[in-house]
Amino acid sequence: MFKKLFLLAVLAAFAFGAEAKVSLYELLSTPNNKSLLKRLGRENILSSKSEPGTQAIFFMSAKSKPELFYVLEFYKDEAAYKKHLSSAHFKKFASASAEILASKKAISLKKRAAFSKNLTPEHLKDAYFHITNLSLLAKSDAKFEKIIKKYMQKSVDEGAYAQFAFSQKDAPNKWVLVEIYKDEASFESYRH
């Protein structure tokens, strides 16, 4: 299943260590509350800039379904993630957004591949995100990881800022690929 996404806000440049904590959330806003959810998300992200260990937070909405939002978070480690969860600004976001969400799904991820070039807040202002969810055949994840790493490493350039591959921690055969492009035209040029 493909979801074409655009960037709402970005936090900071980051590097991924072995202990990095990555989370993905799917948030479905109730009717007429998309703007409020965007505002709450932006406030939470901007308030998170000064948190040590918070590396990046991407807040995106689906082009095909504007009330569907994704939050992709990168933390130095589990301790940094827990510190973010206990912050006043996150508690405010969680409390206020709970009243306007039709659903919320948390997906715990394991990093499999991460390649980036020119991934800075300035470059990401008009960036285009593409998320792909895959279900692999049983016991094929190691082979797929090798293939996807080679492909992603070659794909990162001036038009493709980043390529990430994750597997779900509770279902290793379910993968999430996140691609960040300069703009939608760059994404379309890579598809052909």
Task: Name every feature range the model reports, one short phrase each.
Residues 4-14:
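Sec-dependent N-terminal signal peptides
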Residues 17-69, 74-86, 91, 98-192:
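Short S/T/G/P-rich N-terminal loop/turn motif that feeds into the first structured element of a domain
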